Amino acid sequence: MASKKGDPEELYVRQEKIGKGSFGEVFKGINKKTNETIAIKTIDLEDAEDEIEDIQQEINVLSQCESPFVTKYFGSFLKGSKLWIIMEYLAGGSVLDLMKPGPFDEGYIAIILRELLKGLEYLHSEGKIHRDIKAANVLLSASGDVKLADFGVSGQLTDQMTKRNTFVGTPFWMAPEVIKQTGYDSKADIWSMGITALEMAKGEPPRADLHPMRALFLIPKDPPPTLEGNFSKGFKEFCALCLNKDPNQRPTAKDLLKHKFIKAAKKTSSLTDLIERRQKWLQLNGNNADDENDDLDRDAKSNEEDFGWEFPTIKQKSPVAVQEQQQTPQKPTVVSTPIKEQQQQQQPTPVTTPQQPVTTTTTTPTTETKVRSLSNSSQTTPVKTTVAATTAPATTPASNAPTSTTPNGAAVTQQQAPRASALTSVIYPVLSKLLKNTSDENVINALAQLKMAFDNAEKAKPGITHSLIAQIIETLKR
């Protein structure tokens, strides 16, 4: 997506900060020409070098969406290393903001879910998956219109790719198949919407009292959460349909719009009651009450720091990039290379390392180079190749890969089974963080040996890392 030239401050007046979105801060603003109120997301690309691909993904998705149920995108501007993304201003705030005074009555929940389903029906019909549905990413206008926001981790499904394998989302809202990396499709959004329904009814998602890492182990293992309490049979049934652990048994957004609980929902104008409720709550508690650290996402982020996780939203490269290897890890280096569209993308070149771990220096493009890639046409996408606590990918001849057929008859090459998510999503990030924070050669060598030990153990007995971490968590609980 091309960014516009010129100084955005000549076109817009940036006013007070109104929140934080994926990658940056969000301000209220005014279009000088039309006097229209808009939202301005500002991102310092020098501070977000590793997220440039994801930022461009959000811009690409927003620019392609034309729906009354998705936040409008008006354009983006580069000023030095600062990126301005101009979007529709939604004065009602997020559903999470509106929940600060307390959970919602189910009548309001039904309205929000209906509008959310309309947004998902549109996205899914366009072959897109949101992948981060939660109350914080659902916004309201002053008149009660409901819109989906925050597309930083959205995915695109094509005829040649019926299921994705990337590990993304926010832990408490993640579908079991996403965590297990068995491949997923738009039904993952339906699960997350079911969790969001429970969040609105109870004030927080299931397992919110647990560390996010423990939640990741329990979600695929335990029975699905249910809506308990004084709620209607229709609402409980709706949640149960969304939270079926078998994605093939979950209804589509289109089907759920026909559910009796949704069909009985009132007009969106009723949601202005929630906006007024929050305004009264702010008057009683002071405007600073909105800034308190009671956001579950922020709590999760502070809890995870000891484990080397990056919450609230996780995005991991496709498991294909972490296939079995026999090579020695290096000090982490991130290389960002602009390449043509994904159909021209080649497998990363395997990295040859010496027998003993050493610290290597790799010339990396500057932030300025990455920033320029955002200004180019949509034919160029910056892609990150990470040489970190992962090893180089093994190349598998396409001719040996099993194939299947999509419903429309297109041949699909199935990806090899991904490595254990515990190894690629827990051990590697922790080792990478430890490696980044030390210059002691003894520590570096020890970490390299530790990683090799995990690699060898996982190769000898797939899933052993998951079992080990699960046992550690059980021990710590005692």
Curated annotation (Swiss-Prot):
The active site is at 132 (proton acceptor). Residues 323-340 have a biased composition (Polar residues). Signal peptide: none annotated. Autophosphorylated. PROSITE patterns: PROTEIN_KINASE_ATP (PS00107), PROTEIN_KINASE_DOM (PS50011). Gene3D superfamilies: 1.10.12.70, Phosphorylase Kinase, domain 1, Transferase(Phosphotransferase) domain 1. Transmembrane segments: none annotated. Disruption phenotype: Defects in cytokinesis, leading to multinucleated cells caused by failure to sever the final connecting bridge between the 2 daughter cells. Cells also display defects in development and directed slug movement. The keyword Cell division applies. Optimum pH is 7.5. It is an enzyme of class 2 (transferase). CDD domains: STKc_MST3_like. The keyword Iron does not apply. Its EC number is 2.7.11.1. GO terms for biological process: cell division; hippo signaling; hyperosmotic response; intracellular signal transduction; positive regulation of cell division; positive regulation of mitotic cytokinetic process; protein phosphorylation; regulation of actin cytoskeleton organization. Residues 306-410 are annotated as: Disordered. ATP binds at residues 18-26, 41. Involved in regulation of actin cytoskeleton organization during cell motility; F-actin fragmenting and capping protein allowing dynamic rearrangements of the actin cytoskeleton. Also part of a regulatory pathway from the centrosome to the midzone, thus regulating the completion of cell division. Belongs to the protein kinase superfamily. STE Ser/Thr protein kinase family. STE20 subfamily. This is Serine/threonine-protein kinase svkA. It comes from Dictyostelium discoideum. The gene is svkA.
